[in-house]
Amino acid sequence: MLLELISYAGTVSGFLFLTLSIASGLYYISELVEEHTEPTRRFLTRAIYGIILILILLLLLDGFPFKLTLFSIACYIVYYQNLKSFPFISLTSPTFLLSCVCVVLNHYFWFKYFNDTEVPPQFKFDPNYIPRRRASFAEVASFFGICVWFIPFALFVSLSAGDYVLPTTSEQHMAKKNDDITTNNQPKFRKRAVGLARVVINSVRKYIYSLARVFGYEIEPDFDRLAV
């Protein structure tokens, strides 16, 4: 009985630590991408071309379905459109919304394809029918990781929501005075890249802070200190 309770506590603790580790990794990668925007754009562009080439080779060599492969290539063309305004993206833009739909449909169609093991009705009583080779778990997981999830996940980490902020003191010193300061001595706002991953993580963190306040706990965001 006690051992079972310990196993539940260990499972929950492991899940929480895993979630925090993934969130920390996403936060770090998002900050890293913000500092190296142009190399990230080139990497994503080449990755999209490479995955399209892989899909074509799978069609020719492994007999993947033509229509589904063509649909996946069309999805990657849609993903590529997000790079035109990289790293900034509008969450209500048609391209971004269409990309979200493509991610869901592409995952669903490929999952259905690999999970379909039924024999076609016209071949059920054919003794010479050779069923399609069923892919192993490693093959399916690798295909989904590289050809289905990699680019959407990379775009989620790399793309940024525009946020208008005041320029820093060093930026004001290095930039021209007429460009940074208006005639009314009011500093102009500039657009800063804020990664979508950071936006999501910060939103979740703020929600946890507000939820803790409801139960009478005060978390100071500057020091992450919990006070009653």
Swiss-Prot record:
Cytoplasmic side: 1, 60-88, 167-228
GO CC, alphabetical: COPII-coated ER to Golgi transport vesicle; endoplasmic reticulum; endoplasmic reticulum membrane; Golgi membrane
PTM info: N-glycosylated.
A Pfam family assignment: Erv26
Gene Ontology molecular functions: COPII receptor activity
Residue positions with a glycan: 115
Domain of life, per lineage: Eukaryota
Membrane topology reported for the UniProt record: Multi-pass membrane protein
Main localization (coarse): Golgi
Record's keyword terms, sorted: Glycoprotein, Golgi apparatus, Membrane, Protein transport, Transmembrane, Transmembrane helix, Transport
Parts of the chain on the Lumenal side: 23-42, 106-142
One GO BP: fungal-type cell wall organization
Transmembrane segments: 2-22, 43-59, 89-105, 143-166
Subcellular location: Golgi apparatus, cis-Golgi network membrane
PANTHER family, sorted: PROTEIN TEX261 (PTHR13144:SF0), TEX261 PROTEIN (PTHR13144)
Function: Plays a role in retention of a subset of membrane proteins in the early Golgi compartments. Facilitates endoplasmic reticulum to Golgi transport of mannosyltransferases MNN2 and MNN5.
Quaternary data: Interacts with itself. Interacts with KTR3, MNN2 and MNN5.
Family membership: Belongs to the SVP26 family.
Additional remarks: Present with 1810 molecules/cell in log phase SD medium.
Annotated protein name in UniProt: Protein SVP26
Source organism phylogeny: Eukaryota, Fungi, Dikarya, Ascomycota, Saccharomycotina
